[in-house]
């Protein structure tokens, strides 16, 4: 497994699927450009430098929080690029994201997905992320309905004491790697 970490210029811009304003926070909605850059520039560059499979089933995308959101978004926008998805606490509370998922067609191709969320994520917030757990539950149900390939694998994991913190992101990222690869 070769793992490449990409530091975003601006997570709120690069990793969000469409522009939105929540309270006084502006989100840039540049996820399409980010995913296209990864698919059309980063992966081909890595293939030139390393012996990496040409088969999308061997290529994955992963992220936590907004990184998880953009990784999930990639499933719908670039399903032909990635075969594995690690979604650690993806920010599916993002305005209209669950609605977006409901509007997507069924996914016939094979994908291996690991999704984690802590049961206490957002509980102490008065921001939209207070809906993290119920929005995750709705999104997981939708994804289960959309994944129709008999060869797809979908793991959903949770921790009743889990918070939206790096400690949990690392712990469950390691679990995801062990499950998917």
Go through the PLM ranges and name each one.
Residues 1-181:
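Non-catalytic cap/lid and distal C-terminal segments of serine-dependent acyl enzymes
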């Amino acid at each position: 497994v070769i793992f490449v970490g990409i530091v975003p210029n601006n997570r709120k811009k690069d990793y969000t699927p469409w522009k939105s304003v929540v309270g006084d926070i502006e989100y840039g909605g540049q996820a399409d450009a980010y995913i296209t850059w990864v698919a059309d520039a980063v992966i081909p560059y890595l293939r030139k430098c390393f012996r990496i499979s040409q088969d999308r089933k061997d290529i994955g995308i992963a992220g936590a929080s907004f990184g998880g959101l953009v990784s999930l978004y990639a499933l719908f926008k670039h399903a032909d690029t990635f075969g594995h998805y690690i979604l650690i606490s993806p920010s599916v509370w993002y305005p209209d994201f669950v609605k977006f998922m409901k509007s997507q067609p069924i996914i016939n191709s094979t994908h291996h997905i690991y999704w984690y969320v802590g049961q206490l994520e957002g509980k102490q917030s008065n921001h939209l992320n207070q809906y993290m757990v119920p929005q995750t539950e709705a999104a997981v149900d939708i994804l289960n309905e959309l994944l129709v390939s008999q060869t797809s694998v979908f793991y959903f994991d949770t921790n009743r004491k889990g918070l939206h913190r790096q400690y949990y992101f690392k712990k469950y990222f390691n679990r995801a790697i062990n499950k998917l690869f």
